């Protein structure tokens, strides 16, 4: 299974810590074989793993860019496009037992937070209009209507 995320350095150091914590947890997940990280600057990430594949770009990728990358580079594989602040657990194994052909799952998250930057709490995120990860098997159809980036208000529901 392939995880595809966008990574960038936020001006908020606590937020950067959250992104790195989530990345570290996902790299430790045995169900995730590869993590494809779309980034604008290769020097932004300060640790390495054989699972990490950096895709350096001059600009932020749109959803269409991410889905087309999966179609072209990860043919006939399960892909998980997710926000950088998402951690996956062993429930990903559920998708390995499904016929994922022409299926597309949009999932919301559980919220993680910290008050001191060291101790993290995890709780359900209560917002029915939120999706933070998209799981599918390539190929999937794409269109120009997907030309918007992650992290923009309302992007989850387009």
In which residue ranges do the predicted regions lie?
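Conserved catalytic core of nucleotide-sugar-dependent glycosyltransferases
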Residues: 71, 86-158
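Short, acidic, metal-binding catalytic loop of nucleotide-sugar glycosyltransferases
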Residues: 16-33
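Amphipathic coiled-coil/heptad-repeat helices and related helical stalk/stem segments
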Residues: 19-22, 62-66, 156
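N-proximal low-complexity "stem/linker" segments adjacent to membrane-targeting elements
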Residues: 1-20
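Active-site acidic Asp-centered loop
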Residues: 81-83
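Hydrophobic targeting segments
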Residues: 1-5, 26, 34-37
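Short coil/turn segments at beta-strand junctions that form active-site/ligand-binding loops
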Residues: 33, 75-78, 101-102
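Active-site-proximal specificity loops/subdomain of glycosyltransferases
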Residues: 8-9, 13, 37-79, 90
């Amino acid at each position: 299974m392939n995880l595809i995320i966008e990574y960038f350095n936020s001006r908020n150091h606590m937020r950067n810590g959250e992104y790195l914590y989530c990345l570290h947890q996902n790299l430790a997940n045995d169900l995730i074989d590869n993590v494809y990280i779309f980034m604008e600057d290769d020097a932004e990430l300060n640790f390495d793993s054989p699972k990490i594949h950096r895709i350096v770009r001059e600009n932020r990728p749109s959803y269409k860019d991410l889905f087309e990358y999966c179609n072209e580079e990860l043919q006939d594989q399960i892909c998980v496009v997710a926000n950088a602040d998402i951690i996956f657990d062993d429930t990903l194994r559920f998708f390995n037992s499904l016929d994922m052909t022409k299926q597309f799952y949009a999932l919301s998250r559980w919220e993680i937070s910290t008050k001191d930057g060291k101790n993290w709490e995890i709780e359900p995120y209560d917002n029915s209009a939120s999706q933070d990860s998209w799981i599918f098997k390539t190929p999937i159809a794409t269109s120009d209507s997907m030309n918007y980036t992650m992290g923009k208000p309302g992007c989850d529901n387009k």
